[in-house]
Swiss-Prot record:
Keyword annotations: Ribonucleoprotein, Ribosomal protein
Native source organism of the sequence: Methanococcus maripaludis (strain DSM 14266 / JCM 13030 / NBRC 101832 / S2 / LL)
Encoding gene (name): rpl30
PANTHER family linked: 60S RIBOSOMAL PROTEIN L7, LARGE RIBOSOMAL SUBUNIT PROTEIN UL30
Pfam family, one: Ribosomal_L30
Assembly and interaction partners: Part of the 50S ribosomal subunit.
Domain of life: Archaea
One GO MF term attached to the UniProt entry: structural constituent of ribosome
Disulfide-bonded cysteines: none
One GO term (biological process): maturation of LSU-rRNA from tricistronic rRNA transcript (SSU-rRNA, 5.8S rRNA, LSU-rRNA)
UniProt protein name: Large ribosomal subunit protein uL30
């Protein structure tokens, strides 16, 4: 299983240790997204920054769309299905399955590990970006609903 982590809040007033954890996760700007495996180390990092990000389990279809629409190569070159197959020797769907299963990490491929997204169309549909998802906000764990958010942001 893999998590999609999206930075929702900015950097003003962030404690130093949380800012360092954001840098380690490569979440330098708002609306940046990373795909990380479900390991003990990453889980601890996510818990530390949960008040500044939203995260959940990404599904295969959303990951394929994310790679093709917002994935980039060094030099800001766009990706296509043929280019992904040529560079990784795997079709996009199979690459997505292996990333979700934890067999491959995005950072081990030529694809840039950070996906730069738009702000969500029609907003977060919630009470704002300063409250947790469970009480009506946009922050924290949102399980499978992260896929709906990512589709609004692509």
């Amino acid at each position: 299983m893999a998590y999609a982590v999206v930075r929702v809040r900015g950097s003003v007033g962030v404690r130093g240790d949380i800012a360092d954890t954001m840098k380690m996760l490569r979440l330098h700007r708002v609306n940046h997204c990373v795909i990380i495996p479900d390991t003990e180390h990453y889980t601890g990092m996510i818990k530390k920054v949960k008040d500044y990000v939203t995260y959940g389990e990404i599904d295969k279809d959303t990951l394929v769309a994310l790679i093709l629409k917002r994935g980039r190569l060094p030099g800001n070159k766009r990706l296509s299905e043929e280019l992904v197959k040529e560079l990784t020797e795997l079709p996009v769907e199979e690459l997505a399955e292996k990333v979700i299963a934890g067999e491959i990490k995005i950072k081990d491929t030529p694809i840039k590990p950070v996906f730069r997204l738009h702000p969500p169309r029609k907003g977060y549909d919630r009470a704002g970006v300063k409250k947790g998802f469970s009480i009506g906000g946009a922050l924290g764990y949102r399980s499978g609903k992260i896929n709906d958010l990512l589709n609004k942001m692509m």
